[in-house]
Amino acid sequence: MIHITLPDGSQREYPGPVTVAEVAASIGTGLAKAALAGKVGTGDDAKVVDTSFVINKDMPLSIVTAKDADGLDVIRHSTAHLLAYAVKDLFPDAQVTIGPVIENGFYYDFSYKRPFTPEDLVAIEKRMAELAAKDEPVVRRVLPRDEAVAYFKGIGENYKAEIIASIPSNEDVSLYREGSFEDLCRGPHVPSTGKLKFFKLMKVAGAYWRGDHRNEMLQRVYGTAWASKDDLQQYLHMLEEAEKRDHRKLGRELDLFHIDEHSPGTVFWHPKGWSLWQEVEQYMRRVYRDNGYQEVKGPQILDKTLWEKTGHWDKYRENMFTTESEKRDYALKPMNCPGHILIFKQGIKSYRDLPLRYGEFGQCHRNEPTGGLHGIMRVRGFTQDDGHVFCTEDQIQPEVLAFTTLLQKVYADFGFSDIIYKVATRPEARIGSDESWDKAEAALINSLEASGCEYVISPGDGAFYGPKIEYTLKDAIGRQWQCGTIQVDFSMPERLDAEYVGEDGDRHRPVMLHRAIVGSLERFIGILIEQHAGAMPTWLAPVQAAVLNITDAQADYVREVAQKLQKAFPNQGLRVATDLRNEKITYKIREHSLQKLPYILVAGDKEKAAGAVAVRARGNKDLGVMSVDAFIELVAKDIAAKA
């Protein structure tokens, strides 16, 4: 007898070996129809299998449907194969290579004699729908490696043969067939093509075979697939919104920054963009000051001997920019932590000095591949709001609790209230005692519970030197951005010999907490631009108000108004632009509206005589005529409320 344990804990008994599909059918016809795959085993041993998978011993089983994350992966993987099937059907000379699942979709790489056109994509997608409607069964078979190589060579699929030839000769490989198309794949796949209904092909791009620029350039067709029509439409709508909000596009239109071919992966900030940067940095500087952090500044270039001690020279060197001077090797720092330990080590530290908090706007460089660069979101040169707390094990929990509370306040001020909390726990390979890990993990979890946060645990995803919390924010269109982190580190203080004198008079190693709230300022500003679609809140806006005259007769008055606004705010003044051009007022209003300014002030003869201005708020909202003092009061409230 075979005993199957279901997710609710109930058991079902079968007289002999049974397939996943048969188990689903025995539970109910609805589940049998919805079944896409099965998940057998538990924990690290759990795996997703085809519905044709035969269960021949007692084991746990859950039926995977389109409602499950695993089900969505199976749908996307199978849709990638459906894409390849359609391409081979329409373009028999095309050769197939690889087609994995990626975030929100899939791609498949093809070798073909000419580039695919937009019209080709339309035809391929139409053919995919036709093949799906035929509801052809997807059938798995297993071949010895050499036999599989011969099979694919025999049908002219040389790329597939090359992939299989790289597999050890004593291994079998699995193939999946749907209709006339058969592909190499580990699986699992949907039981039939009729399960694939909601998909769309997105674009074609170039990709080198095996990622090597010396190899042939292939055509990579990207697509997306979802469990329902609503999910697909929602995703496509989100993409439309994301395109409108693209920080690269808005950066050009709003004259904030540009990326230049003379320095790929680094940002040229224009005056307006640098104003935005300064607002973010000065805000975060106040956060440092108000929460017990001492701001420090370390050098950007450090000798390789330091990076050898930290382990970066061996494990991270290819991502570091290196240079040589007077027969010594140096590297531009990819992170700030070693420098902060060197500062900590200057002078004797006592337990009374702990927790000791350092903060730095540290400029770092990482040699990211050119293909991975993306506007100001993924760069080679970036500045972090990088902080490090040196403390005892007993101080971890209160420090993390205070940090989480602070992070929530900062994110709310920038317009983000939806935060996802993830605790990454100990991996198999790690340093430090189990007792220290127990204490550190409990401190992270207890701190989140004390702050009322719901969290998920990601087992084994911690670094080898300590557990961490990752803070991921959701933006206005539902995208997730992992920005904040707090990481416990038992290793680096040991590697760099950091010590403090304890209450017992002996020397002890401090625990090091790496923490960042916004992370890379460049990336965070890119997120802000997209979150607000370029229409920055008044307190952040590079230009907070523009004052416009109707005729030359009001030019001097406009200058007076601008001067008064600038003087009204003692720290740095309101950021005001004047527009005295001899253009129609409607033209000037429209031009400044396109720059997404919070306020446009218009002065004609009546306003000049009354010592007032006509105020338009963003979104073409007419607030009427008011005194300059009344407008100052209005803006002051906006800024105070971070509106």
Curated annotation (Swiss-Prot):
Annotated Gene Ontology cellular component terms: cytosol
UniProt cofactor note: Binds 1 zinc ion per subunit.
Pfam families linked to this entry: HGTP_anticodon, TGS, tRNA-synt_2b, tRNA_SAD
EC number(s) given by UniProt: 6.1.1.3
Leader sequence segment: none
GO molecular function ontology, one term from the record: metal ion binding
Superkingdom of the organism of origin: Bacteria
Predominant location: cytoplasm
Function recorded in the entry: Catalyzes the attachment of threonine to tRNA(Thr) in a two-step reaction: L-threonine is first activated by ATP to form Thr-AMP and then transferred to the acceptor end of tRNA(Thr). Also edits incorrectly charged L-seryl-tRNA(Thr).
Annotated family: Belongs to the class-II aminoacyl-tRNA synthetase family.
Subunit structure comment from the entry: Homodimer.
NCBIfam families: thrS
Protein's name in the database: Threonine--tRNA ligase
Taxonomic lineage of the native organism: Bacteria, Pseudomonadati, Pseudomonadota, Betaproteobacteria, Burkholderiales
Name of the gene encoding the protein in the UniProt record: thrS
